[in-house]
Amino acid sequence: MKRRLFPLTFSAKMMGFIALLIIAMFVLLGVFLNEQYARTLEEQMGERALSVAQAVALIPELREAFSAERPDEIIQPIAESIRVETGAEFIVVGNTDLIRYAHPLPERIGQRMVGGDNERALVHGESYVSKAVGSLGPSIRGKVPVFDDNGKIIGIVSVGFLMEDIQQVIGERLIAMWQIVVVIMILGLMGTWLVANTVKKATLGLEPEEIGQQFQQKEAILQSIHEGVIAVNKEGKVTLFNQAAMKYVDPELDKEDVLGRHVTDLVKHTRLPEVLQVGKGQYDQELRIGDKQAVVNRVPIYYDHEIVGAVATFRDRNEIKKLSEELTNVKNYADALRAQTHEFSNKLNTISGFLQLGKIDEAVDFIQKERKIQQEWIHFFIERVNDPTVSAVLLGKISQAQELGIDVDIDPSSQLLTPLQERQQELLVTMIGNLLENAFDALLASGIENKKIYISFTDMGDDFIFEVEDNGPGIPPQLMESIFEEGFSTKEGTHRGFGLALVKKAVHELGGAIFLEEGELGGACFVLTIPKHEAKEG
């Protein structure tokens, strides 16, 4: 394609187009106003001519003059005085034979009226306005019949204004109108220039082709980002998003379904409206979007020190959280194995002591007793708990409790036979582990001799229900509202106050609830309820 030597800029093109548009618009408007004004003026002049003619036809002296020997001597002075007073071009009065009794040119009195538009007045007795070419030229005239006292038509009055004079008036008015139009056109062109410069500044001096290229580049970058991105205007309506964001919101939504919608229609609990109001960014905040947990960053967008929108980026929290939970579970397993190893070592030492003392029977009794206890626990979990991971965690925690000198009792009617979803299993292991760790810490810090923990669980009904109770000092009433806050702890030391906060987050993610009560053992009693079908947001 051949390039122009001097290519026109977008501003120049726009200015030229708008200028042509303004000129064409005002030219058409001028022509329309010209026609409208000419038509209106002609109608006004016609009505004026008709009203003068009607007034003349009703003058008694004029009507009586038709029966005089020389009507023109009476009628001509009357008609002329009225013509001069009203500014009419002519007032012609004639009889039924169209012989003139009055005319602005006296030499034409006695001659026949011309124009061919008198029949309606003389024959039908009508009053009307007509256009015709008379002896003085083209004119607009009002025609009125003259009646005698008996209602008989005895003549006609014709009052007119020459078209030439009307066109002159129209021309004078049009000159003034076109002067105004020209001034408005000049102002319009100046406005066009201002608009063109404003657009140029708003587009940072970029041409449409450059804007298009940058838009495509931005779109490619936006879609290649692994993080979800959603931008809104100051009203909170979506102006930009990428496909990664739609994976969180709804992969089936089209672009047309998203753009222009309020962000809260797509993400229920988003805090972007808050960012728009406050004007401060929010970083690394957790938010549930659909069935996914995300880590969100939100920042306002400023233009000329004014908030014009906001943008949110978010990434999947599940991978990070899953890794964290796996590490937590590994720690629980490690603690359980360490406890079992330590407990097994203690039992071996006990057996060794019996054997060294020669008390074979006591050693055998001890082994059988321990074997029975282990078999009872294993048999219980095989019969009453369907999920091996949950069973393993509970067994490990029981061993850890025994090592710490804590007696663990599980309600014999407890059961967990309903299969767990993968996410439910992962979070349930975290919740059980943290609740039991919390109970261990509370009992060890209390100094109580007979430390006890009571556990019960059931899957009867629509929910999974878990209860963990201890005989420790419990939670003071004034701290019950704060116990689940991240970083809050009743125990001294750093890196505390996260266990119960994690439990609460996990419970809420599964659509459940956690309650803190005073247990029958006198200590704290935590009750979890989790829907069997994992809740989805919205």
From Swiss-Prot:
Write out the coiled-coil annotation as residue ranges.
none
GO BP: regulation of DNA-templated transcription
Q: Cross-referenced Gene3D superfamilies, in alphabetical order?
A: 1.10.287.130, Histidine kinase-like ATPase, C-terminal domain, PAS domain
Q: Which residues cross the membrane?
A: 14-34, 175-195
Q: Which residues lie on this side of the membrane: Cytoplasmic?
A: 1-13, 196-538
Return the GO cellular component terms, semicolon-separated.
plasma membrane
The main location class comes to: membrane
Task: Give residue ranges on the Extracellular side.
Answer: 35-174
PAS domain: residues covered: 216-282
Its EC number(s): 2.7.13.3
Q: Which InterPro entries match?
A: HATPase_C_sf, His_kinase_dom, PAS, PAS-like_dom_sf, PAS_fold, sCache_3, Sensor-like_sf, Sig_transdc_His_kin-like_C
Under catalytic activity, the entry for this protein gives: ATP + protein L-histidine = ADP + protein N-phospho-L-histidine
Name the keywords, alphabetized: ATP-binding, Cell membrane, Kinase, Membrane, Nucleotide-binding, Phosphoprotein, Transferase, Transmembrane, Transmembrane helix, Two-component regulatory system
GO molecular-function terms, A-Z? ATP binding; phosphorelay sensor kinase activity
Q: Membrane topology type, per the record?
A: Multi-pass membrane protein
Which positions bear Phosphohistidine? Answer: H342
Which enzyme class? Answer: transferase
All copies of domain Histidine kinase, residue ranges: 339-534
A single Pfam family it belongs to is PAS
Q: Where in the cell is it found?
A: Cell membrane
> What does the function comment of this entry state?
Member of the two-component regulatory system CitT/CitS. Functions probably as a membrane-associated protein kinase that phosphorylates CitT in response to environmental citrate or Mg(2+)-citrate complex.
Name-wise, this protein is: Sensor protein CitS
Q: What is the lineage of its organism?
A: Bacteria, Bacillati, Bacillota, Bacilli, Bacillales
